[in-house]
Amino acid sequence: FSLTQRESESQDGPLTQVKTTDWERLFDAKNIKLLERKILPAYFKSKYWFGDTSRIIQSMEITNMLDLSKDDLLVKNLIVEVHFNEGLPEMYQLPVSYIANSYESLTEAVPQKGILAEVHFKESSGILVDSVYVEPFRAQLFYSLQAGATLKFGKEKLAFERGNITPDSDIE
């Protein structure tokens, strides 16, 4: 429990502020451009998993989004294509979540490095985060994997398949 307010800064300066009416509008054309041009490039460049950081990003494009929201947990799985000045583009998958400021235990559990932006909806304010830092999302992934779940999104689907384990292992 903490009474101190979280600093509104990322590693490279103040967090980007996004104002829109609701979760779905956060992913309209105007806000997608903000994500592609400002928020995602800054976030990707700060991550160890992001390829060769010396390459110059020419552009980023969100080519697909899957809504993985469940109950009160708002999640979009973004498929991001990154174009560089040289070489072929690379594809990345980034699940993002919105956590309202009223969920203190969840917001405090997200490290500063996992926050992409501050978000202000008509009814609430909070943060847009990398879902890997959100425990309920991780639990949902593991449960879906264990259950062999398939999520359908119109013509697309996301299938969770368990891998093979060694014969002497007994995991339930």
Enumerate the language-model features and the residues they cover.
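Regulatory N- and C-terminal appendages and interdomain linkers associated
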Residues: 1-172
